[in-house]
Structure formats: C-alpha cells, structure tokens
Amino acid sequence: MTRLRMLVLAAVLIASLLVPAGNAAADSPAAKMIRKVNAYRQHRGLRPLHQSRSLNHSSHRYAGQMMHSGYFGHQARIRASGRFKRLGEIIEMHRGHRLDIGGALRAWANSPGHNAILLDGNFSYVGAGLVEGRFHGRRTSMWVMHFGRK
C-alpha cells in the first residue's frame, strides 16, 4: 500500500471516530417522538423538554418489560435514576406492522389524562422508549414516555 493510501485510510478512520455518538440515535423513533412532543408543546406556548438519558433508559426498559410480560398498563413506581422530584408516564400500544409516531402522539393528545402530562409545564426532562415485537401473538409497537422534574 502506498504511503498516500495509508494516510488517506488513517484520516478516514480518525474522522469516523470524531463523529458524535448521538448522531445515530438522533434518527431513532424515540428521538423523533421527543421532537414531535416538543413541537406539540412549543405550539402551545410551552418550552421544549430536555432529553434525559436516565428517562430514555427507564422508558425503554418498561416498554420491554410490558412486551415480554404480556401486561399493558401503568407502573406503580417509575424506576429512573437521577434526582427527579416529580415523574409522569404515558404509554401507548399500536397493533400491526406500521410504526406510526404521529398516531401515537394524536392518541395521547386526545386523551385528557395523557394530554395533561404532555402539556405539564412543570416537567423539564423527557425520555422515550419503543419496543416492537409480539404481544399476545400479534405484531405490536409499545411506546413509553417518562417525564421528569428535578
């Protein structure tokens, strides 16, 4: 291999290491949902929520727990690390093969209890989790969003 080729290869490898890790996750369905929720809040005069790694983790963990246990419902206690003084949870299940982020948000917005959490100005952090799989034998998308205030 010529010296020029080795230098080009080295430059490409170094450049690939410098790309922020968040870029891959920025296009994930969970990141898209958080952007849609923030747009929904901002359209109603509220500030956007900050994404929390801890709330992302707890949301994803609980979505997986529901999918694998066959239970769909709110949990009694949200298990998120960090010092949150207040936490909220919304969940949604979509049956079928098509992931519909907008449909999940519309379902929450049309539910008074869920909409109250979406538009609660006391929350400043958010996390989203999505698990897709089989729930009682049917293809299902399971959403969980956790909201927090420190």
Language model: regions and residue ranges:
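A short alpha-helix/helix-coil micro-patch that ends at or immediately precedes a cysteine
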Residues: 27-68
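Disulfide-stabilized extracellular recognition modules
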Residues: 98-150
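Secretory targeting and sorting signals
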Residues: 1-26
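Short, surface-exposed glycine/acidic/tryptophan-bearing loops
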Residues: 57-101, 118-120
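Residue-level "edge-of-site" marker
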Residues: 54, 79, 131
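Second-shell loop/turn segments in exported
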Residues: 22-28, 42-51, 88-98, 102-105, ...
